[in-house]
A protein has these predicted regions:
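Long internal repeat-built scaffold domains in very large eukaryotic proteins
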Residues: 1, 166-438, 524, 528-617
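Alpha-solenoid helical repeat scaffolds
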Residues: 1-143, 150, 155-162, 318-319, ...
Length: 617
């Protein structure tokens, strides 16, 4: 579009008039009067579209003027400067220096302009090229609602979403579907169900193939959006044996999400036309673990299996024969599975539904773990009889032994996670803790110790007496354990204090103040992560009125004002919220804060005085 004056003879009278007006309005672009600047830039934006060619000198002059107007103090001038510049950008040759300069200027306004209407003007008018897309996607987190909505209404409607990376698609949908404003959520849903679905040949499975169903969260939210917008989809799904026999990851994900949607909205009657009976479901789950499906990648096979188990978790087990078949299959799977946490957890959730009650569930899982431990012990006896064993084989067998131990601990952890009642009536759990969990807590392998401490913590949540008995172990881990174990154990200590209180947990300790002393040590000087976690815990205890100690409050106030906490953003954010919330909760809390502030003025000023003297010297 940028050509010389040799084509003036081919211009129509209207185009010649527009060119003359353009040259006239250029003179007012930098006028002192804001109204003149506004009208001149506005009219230039209108005229640029009607000119087939612009002289090179005029083009460069106009480009420089408009770029300067992008920084005009009046936002309305900047808006029309954006419109004019985006239209002028289309006249520049691709890859030219002028085009690059205009692109950089527009992107800078898109990212940093303080007025939302200016950012929105750039967003709506700039050409959504591959180079520009990352900056457009950033606006899905803009603070202005209309700007966030504009991302899904204008530029994304012109883009083939297949040019985006999967993580960008996920991020765009996540920001839109989870937005706090309903209009943004609606715009994102319309983009997904309209433009994106059309580019997928109106096939929901093809659309899921272009999303990361393994992540689950965003794809699940997208399907929920489809089910809400188009309820007829629910009636269109039917049971097809061929599909279940050779199930794909996307189809399994669709059926599992559909099942959860029906249960969530009390539409379980629609499941009969989609799901087979329990015995048939057990058959298909067994088929996924057989050799017939070994051509699939291990991760894909594991994902499909988890979807099947998610469907089975919500099934109706009124059919006794089907329930027994599923119970037998789940028991076999727990024995054959490796230490994969997600699969074990999925099987456990099905077992909870199948078993009569929690006592039956606990007894069943403990028996399975005992069988696994007995098989391990028998295998070790047989191996011990062999002599002349190679060193490499010993290392391999030791690794296998650790894997089997981890599997047993993972099963125990998942069992405790699914329990809601007290452990006092259970006769099998104490033996499991003594024979498996407590020895594993001192195992040389770090991962084994971590899972064992987690198991013990989950068990203590369910039994106050057990928590008091094992509190000394948690305190020991916090003081002398590995950093990751310290964090884990300290979280457990705070959880138990929140559940049962200091007094109930101190009955088995030689020093009844040991728990509080440990917490005070952790919230003082020490490793940053431990200190931050301890401050979070103490703040929660004070807010919940479970800790009534003026010294603890004094420590938090002093820590907030101490220079050493300046670089710890999480710590300062926690204390900023705590000090405001604590003072407003009750009048007595306000008095306590005032007392600390008045009587500890010297302690508050001392670190800053010391710092000033050091700098002066």
């Amino acid at each position: 579009m940028q050509e010389g004056e040799d084509e003036d003879e081919d211009e129509t009278p209207s185009q010649q008039l527009a060119y003359s007006l353009l040259q006239h309005y250029i003179q007012g672009v930098e006028a002192k009067d804001r109204t003149v600047r506004y009208r001149c830039v506005q009219l230039i934006a209108l005229l640029v579209n009607h000119l087939p060619a612009i002289d090179d000198e005029v083009f460069v002059e106009l480009k420089d003027l408009l770029i300067r107007r992008l920084h005009d103090k009046e936002s309305v001038v900047r808006v029309h400067a954006v419109v004019a510049l985006t239209r002028l950008q289309g006249a520049a040759e691709e890859g030219s220096e002028e085009g690059q300069e205009m692109f950089r200027a527009l992107v800078e306004r898109l990212k940093h302009d303080p007025q939302a209407e200016v950012r929105r003007a750039v967003l709506i008018n700039i050409e959504p090229t591959t180079r520009c897309l990352p900056y457009i996607l950033e606006r899905s987190r803009d603070q202005d609602t209309l700007t966030r909505r504009a991302v899904y209404l204008r530029p994304m409607e012109e883009v083939d979403f297949r040019v985006l990376k999967i993580r960008d698609r996920e991020s765009l949908l996540d920001h839109g579907l989870e937005d706090r404003d309903a209009s943004v959520r609606r715009a994102c849903a319309n983009l997904l169900s309209g433009h994106w679905l059309h580019l997928s040949d109106d096939d929901l499975i093809k659309l899921l193939e272009r999303l990361d169903v393994g992540n689950g969260k965003v794809a699940s939210k997208a399907l929920e959006t489809f089910f809400d917008l188009y309820p007829d989809i629910l009636s269109g799904l039917t049971y097809e044996e061929a599909t279940w026999t050779a199930m794909k990851a996307e189809h399994a994900f669709l059926i599992r999400t559909f099942t959860e949607h029906c249960h969530r909205h009390d539409q379980t009657s629609k499941l009969d036309q989609v799901l087979p009976d329990i015995s048939t479901q057990a058959y298909f789950i067994r088929n996924e673990t057989g050799e017939e499906r070994q051509e699939l990648v291990a991760d894909e096979l594991s994902f499909i299996l988890r979807q099947f188990l998610g469907i089975a978790r919500l099934a109706d087990y009124s059919d006794e024969m089907g329930r027994r078949n599923m119970f037998t299959l789940m028991r076999q799977m727990l024995i054959k599975l490796g230490p994969e946490e997600e699969l074990i957890r999925a099987v456990m959730e099905v077992m909870v539904r199948i078993c009569v009650d929690e006592r039956d569930f606990t007894q069943t899982i403990v028996e399975i773990i005992s069988d696994l431990r007995e098989e391990e012990g028998g295998g070790e006896d047989e191996k011990g009889e062999e002599e002349g064993e190679e060193e490499g084989n010993k290392e391999t067998k030791e690794t296998e032994k650790v894997h089997r131990l981890l599997k047993s601990l993972e099963m125990a952890r998942c069992m405790f996670e699914n329990l809601r009642g007290s452990l006092q009536q259970s006769t099998s759990v104490p033996g499991l803790l003594q024979e498996l969990v407590l020895p594993a807590a001192v195992h040389p392998h770090l991962e084994v110790r971590e899972v064992a401490v987690t198991c013990l913590g989950l068990a203590c949540y369910l039994d106050k007496r057990l928590a008091a008995q094992r509190m000394e172990l948690f305190l020991h881990v916090v003081r002398y354990g590995h950093l990751e174990l310290q964090i884990m154990a300290l979280k457990i200590v705070f959880d138990l204090v929140m559940l049962f209180g200091f007094q109930a947990l101190s009955t088995s300790l030689e020093d009844p103040h040991e728990i509080f002393r440990l917490i005070a040590d952790c919230s003082g000087e020490g490793e940053t992560t431990i200190q931050t976690l301890a401050v979070h815990g103490v703040s929660k205890l004070l807010l919940a009125d479970l800790l009534d100690d003026q010294q603890a409050l004094k420590s938090l106030v002093l820590l907030y004002f101490h220079p050493s906490s300046t670089d710890n953003a999480r710590l300062r954010q926690c204390l900023s919220f705590f000090l405001q919330a604590f003072g407003r909760m009750a009048y007595k809390n306000h008095d306590r804060l005032c007392e600390v502030s008045l009587y500890e003025r010297g302690s508050l000023l001392l670190p800053y005085l010391s710092l000033s003297v050091t700098i002066f010297l």
